[in-house]
């Protein structure tokens, strides 16, 4: 399995096994004693009280589904190698979730989005937050932005590089999926912000979102710093990824069609967009980059 995975994915899976799966199932003893009930109990435990970071509560459905998938893959390998006669986890199923948005997800209105952007004025994360809201970028895409991806002459911004965190920080010339690569128009607000950053950029780095000495922002700094500024300004607690959700909900609320929202967010399929944003639909007029510009003007 190692040869088929990207480094960051492999490292994340290693964490799942070492922190969660192996410690839990060690109590079972011999692998031949493992039953479907053991696996089901593990799933239920992780959903309700299975965090390993000292916080209360369970893991998300998405994360636990990854755990189950890894367990099934590992046990399939055990069958192939002759350690066990059959895979006891094959009969364990999880209810399919049709929504990527949960009750904890915060969807900002356009006015609320402005308040969030204003709260970060003068803060190192100002550009990260602005870019995430305007273009619906993922954290990895925001951190992966290089000056070479900005063309002030053509007025374009390209998404073609990411920075992710596994056991180490990894920068790579690839995106989450092939459809994640994109070219956006630089709206006036973003163009002005980037020009100002470019004038005072550190000379020893090619990345945009960095410290004054050129060091790249760590992904976990973005997460924690984002939460801290929201709290200090009395704003509602939300995840950095909720900015991406908010981008589409704002556009969809203004009349963007489902297909256009899919293209802007660069989802693989329209079902993903529909599952997340269908409840935000109110209008049906076509919006383009000019509308994005109008929404995010000063």
Which role fits each region the language model picked out?
Residues 18, 72-75, 79, 281, ...:
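C-terminal flanking helix
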Residues 1-57:
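Basic/aromatic-enriched alpha-helical hairpins
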Residues 154, 165-192, 212-213, 254, ...:
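C-terminal secondary-structure termini that scaffold catalytic or DNA-interacting sites
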Residues 53, 118-125, 135, 184, ...:
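Short, basic (Lys/Arg/His-rich) helix/loop patches that form interaction surfaces
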Residues 56-61, 65-69, 80-145, 153, ...:
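Basic, Lys/Arg- and aromatic-enriched nucleic-acid-binding interface segment
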Residues 144-150, 262-268, 278:
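A short, basic/aromatic helix-end/turn motif that makes direct DNA contacts
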Residues 6-9, 13, 35, 63, ...:
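Hydrophobic (often cysteine-bearing) scaffold residues that line and stabilize catalytic clefts
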Residues 98-99, 163, 265-290:
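Catalytic-site neighborhood detector that most strongly recognizes the C-terminal catalytic loop/helix
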């Amino acid at each position: 399995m190692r040869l088929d995975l990207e480094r960051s994915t492999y490292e994340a899976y290693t964490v799942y096994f070492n922190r969660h799966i192996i410690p839990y199932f060690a109590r079972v003893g011999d692998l031949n004693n493992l039953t479907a009930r053991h696996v089901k109990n593990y799933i239920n435990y992780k959903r309700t009280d299975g965090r390993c970071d000292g916080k209360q509560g369970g893991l998300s459905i998405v994360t636990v589904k990854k755990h189950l998938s890894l367990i099934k893959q590992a046990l399939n390998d055990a069958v192939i190698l002759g350690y066990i006669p059959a895979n006891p986890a094959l009969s364990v199923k999880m209810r399919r979730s049709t929504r990527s948005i949960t009750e904890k997800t915060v969807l900002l209105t356009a006015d609320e989005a402005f308040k969030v952007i204003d709260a970060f004025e003068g803060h190192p994360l100002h550009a990260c937050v602005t870019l995430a809201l305007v273009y619906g970028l993922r954290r990895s895409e925001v951190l992966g932005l290089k000056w070479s991806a900005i063309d002030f002459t053509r007025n374009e911004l390209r998404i073609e590089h990411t920075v992710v965190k596994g056991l180490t920080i990894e920068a790579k010339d690839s995106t989450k999926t092939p459809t994640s690569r994109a070219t956006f128009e630089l709206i006036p607000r973003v163009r002005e912000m980037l020009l100002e950053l470019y004038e005072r950029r550190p000379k020893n780095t090619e990345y945009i979102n960095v410290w004054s000495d050129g060091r790249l922002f760590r992904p976990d700094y973005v997460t924690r710093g984002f939460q801290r500024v929201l709290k200090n300004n009395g704003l509602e607690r939300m995840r950095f990824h909720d900015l991406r959700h908010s981008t589409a909900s704002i556009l969809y609320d203004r009349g963007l069609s489902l297909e256009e929202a899919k293209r802007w967010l660069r989802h693989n399929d329209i079902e993903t967009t529909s599952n997340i944003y269908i409840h935000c639909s109110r209008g049906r007029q076509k919006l383009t980059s000019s509308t994005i510009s109008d929404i995010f003007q000063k």
